[in-house]
Amino acid sequence: MGRLTTHVLDTAAGTPGKDLAITLFKIVNNLRQPIKTVRTNHDGRCEAPLLEGEALQAGIYELDFAVGDYYRAAGVSLPDPAFLDVVTLRFGVADAGAHYHVPLLVSPWSYSTYRGS
């Protein structure tokens, strides 16, 4: 059964990115269709897969990570506008039966991702 998961690591603080808002979109005809918004838990993870089973279909998706709000809530001084406010990751799902883990490693000045397991 396929599933889509994520987690957030705050590389500036060396801690999980807890209570960070994430919005999932599916891209259909070049338009973003919102699917759900969740918040990470104390471990920087979502309580459940973002999508699983029949809900995960082949196609293009985006995850919006509200990193500016996360850092402001943590008391980090950011410029106005913030260098990174919303980090958007666009990725493709070719095999809807596979596990797609799309983590975000982030600081106020940089981010990276990879396809995890």
Swiss-Prot record:
Reaction(s) catalysed by this chain's protein: 5-hydroxyisourate + H2O = 5-hydroxy-2-oxo-4-ureido-2,5-dihydro-1H-imidazole-5-carboxylate + H(+)
Binding residues annotated for substrate, in chain numbering: H7, R45, Y114
Biological process terms in GO annotation: purine nucleobase metabolic process
Enzyme superclass (EC): hydrolase
GO molecular-function term, one example from the UniProt record: hydroxyisourate hydrolase activity
Keyword terms: Hydrolase, Purine metabolism
SUPFAM superfamilies recorded: Transthyretin (synonym: prealbumin) (SSF49472)
InterPro entries, per the entry: Hydroxyisourate_hydrolase (IPR014306), Thyroxine_BS (IPR023418), Transthyretin/HIU_hydrolase (IPR000895), Transthyretin/HIU_hydrolase_d (IPR023416), Transthyretin/HIU_hydrolase_sf (IPR036817), Transthyretin_CS (IPR023419)
CDD domains, A to Z: TLP_HIUase
Pfam families, sorted: Transthyretin
Assembly behavior: Homotetramer.
Family: Belongs to the transthyretin family. 5-hydroxyisourate hydrolase subfamily.
Other facts noted in the record for this chain: HIU hydrolysis also occurs spontaneously, but more slowly.
NCBIfam families: hdxy_isourate
Protein name (database record): 5-hydroxyisourate hydrolase
Organism: Ralstonia nicotianae (strain ATCC BAA-1114 / GMI1000)
